[in-house]
Amino acid sequence: NNTELYILDIISGKHEAITDRDGPDFSPKVSNDRSLIAYLGYDDEYLSYQQSSIYVMRRDGSDKYKIEMDLDRNISNIFWSGNDKRIYFQYDDNGITKIGSTTLDGSQETVVDEVGGLSFSRPYSGGFFSLSKNNRYSFTYGTAYNPADLATGYKGSKRRITNLNKDLFDYKKLGKVEEIWYQSSYDGRMIQGWIVKPPNFDNSK
């Protein structure tokens, strides 16, 4: 679990590692002006689970630093904004996959939520997004009622552009999905769950 990032000269074939810490470094993205590289990784503490963070360095591997954000979540799928002032990323928060962005000094914000999975038969979270040079984003959109569609947006907006399950929903009615939280009897921690009620459920019956 100790991967490094390399620079490869495609003419000579020479390559050089530009990271060297004890821990994984992966998913490099070069800034649009070609001066910086953003990447994901963490210092390996040999634990069963560790969260990936965003790091930035110069193109030659110098001046590495971690972007310190007030966000206790695992980060994935990074993109530079068109002007290289922000980095967009993906993360999961309480069962919902979101797109966020941060400045290079860690000023973080949530851009949009309801990033959905890739299976049209199941409303799983996860999924992917991409970012254009003018900061418009496209992503796999999904809710409990509309799994595996596509959406696009700009500056926090979102517009669904597909309706892949329309032929099914024309004659099927879904039950209402409710999020619930309850306290563990073992250690008092809060546990998240969901209730799916039958279609046309009447609480009085």
Go through each PLM region and give its residues.
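Non-catalytic accessory segments flanking enzyme active sites
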Residues: 1, 90, 110-204
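A flexible loop/linker signature enriched in serine peptidases of the S9 family
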Residues: 1-6, 17-26, 38-55, 66-76, ...
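Short loop/turn segments that connect beta-strands within beta-propeller blades
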Residues: 9-13, 58-62, 103-107, 154-156
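Conserved beta-strand positions that form and line the central face of beta-propeller blades
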Residues: 14-18, 36, 65-67, 98, ...
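Conserved beta-strand position repeated once per blade in WD40 beta-propeller domains
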Residues: 27, 77-79, 128
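Residue-level detector of Asp-centered blade-edge/turn motifs that repeat once per structural unit
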Residues: 32-33, 82-83, 131-133
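Hydrophobic beta-strand positions that form the internal "hydrophobic ladder"
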Residues: 34-37, 86-87, 137-138
